[in-house]
Amino acid sequence: MSKDIATPGRTTEILKKYGFLFKKSLGQNFLIDSNILTRITDTAEITKETNVIEIGPGIGALTEQLAKTANEVVAFEIDQRLLPILDDTLSAYNNIQVVHGDVLKADVEEVIAEQFAKPDLPLKIVANLPYYVTTPIILKLLHDNIPADSMTFMLQKEVADRISAVPSTKSYGSLTIAIQFYMEAELAFIVPKTVFMPQPNVDSAVIHLKRRKEPLAEVNDEEFFFEVTRASFAQRRKTLWNNLASKFPALKPRKDELVEGLNAIGIDLIRRGETLDIPEFAKLSNFLGDFLKEK
């Protein structure tokens, strides 16, 4: 079997063989350090009793490592130019299926049912995500309720900081809440920019998301809950009142009544959104939802 893909020499050899040119628009940066790949699969807790979905396999470096440790791997690749390369680099493995397509447009549950020989095995999602589509992909996987026990992503460190943030920090925001509402988030380790080809401008990080048995807080309307959280961070330096009144103008004539009601449940509208934890946002959105329905 050929040596691991994730080395500078082997990666360069593959790229030259196929005359492959990186597409900046697809955020293509290939990992050239196999030690990082081992740490990713260890973080994801992949075993031979695990099915894995990978997004953006590139030339197959992470895919190869996943295939060594998982039962079966299904990889989504959007760039048609990479399909013959993957056929070549992964030819030694019989437990990999490469699906040509955009995961953002795919029916992932249908792919799971059709592509995995044993679709009922525990599922994990692992990916080196392109920076430009990181947030849309993660939110799609959450909102489509893909039955994955965990998701392990390598992504831009700044985004990993936002996903794993705690209240009253500059990284904490609506993205934090959108993900931590459903998942426990752990920033596992930092990945220096020097282990990629081509080298990106910033460092990356690996984040591990583990599905909660129940959402972190009870809300009456999830869609409205996320609408309230996004509004609360619309302008970070503004108070809850200023942001919410801008989003929901019907609140303005009833400010005194609203202040009194929220004070009764421990929420002061002079606070900023970044100071509220997820259970407090749940109380806020539940109260606001009922309040706005009143005549």
Curated annotation (Swiss-Prot):
Member of which family? Belongs to the class I-like SAM-binding methyltransferase superfamily. rRNA adenine N(6)-methyltransferase family. RsmA subfamily.
Q: What Enzyme Commission number(s) apply to this enzyme?
A: 2.1.1.182
Note the superkingdom of the native organism.
Bacteria
NCBIfam families attached to this UniProt entry: ksgA
Statement: the UniProt record of this protein carries the keyword RNA-binding? yes
Which terms in the GO cellular component ontology are assigned?
cytosol
Q: Which residues bind S-adenosyl-L-methionine?
A: 29, 31, 56, 77, 102, 128
SUPFAM superfamilies from the xrefs?
Answer: S-adenosyl-L-methionine-dependent methyltransferases (SSF53335)
Membrane-traversing stretches: none
Primary subcellular site in the record, as a coarse category: cytoplasm
Give the organism the record lists. Answer: Listeria monocytogenes serotype 4b (strain CLIP80459)
Q: Which reaction does it catalyse?
A: adenosine(1518)/adenosine(1519) in 16S rRNA + 4 S-adenosyl-L-methionine = N(6)-dimethyladenosine(1518)/N(6)-dimethyladenosine(1519) in 16S rRNA + 4 S-adenosyl-L-homocysteine + 4 H(+)
Q: What class of enzyme is it?
A: transferase
Q: Which GO terms describe its molecular function?
A: 16S rRNA (adenine(1518)-N(6)/adenine(1519)-N(6))-dimethyltransferase activity; RNA binding
Identify the keywords attached in UniProt to this record, alphabetized.
Cytoplasm, Methyltransferase, RNA-binding, rRNA processing, S-adenosyl-L-methionine, Transferase
Please give the function described in this protein's UniProt entry. Specifically dimethylates two adjacent adenosines (A1518 and A1519) in the loop of a conserved hairpin near the 3'-end of 16S rRNA in the 30S particle. May play a critical role in biogenesis of 30S subunits.
Alphabetized InterPro entries for the sequence: KsgA/Erm, rRNA_Ade_diMease-like_C, rRNA_Ade_Mease_Trfase_CS, rRNA_Ade_methylase_Trfase_N, rRNA_adenine_dimethylase, SAM-dependent_MTases_sf
Q: What is this protein called?
A: Ribosomal RNA small subunit methyltransferase A
- The yes or no answer to whether the keyword Signal is present is no
Which PROSITE patterns has this protein been placed in? Answer: RRNA_A_DIMETH, SAM_RNA_A_N6_MT
Which Pfam families does this chain map to?
RrnaAD
Could you tell me where this protein is found in the cell? Answer: Cytoplasm
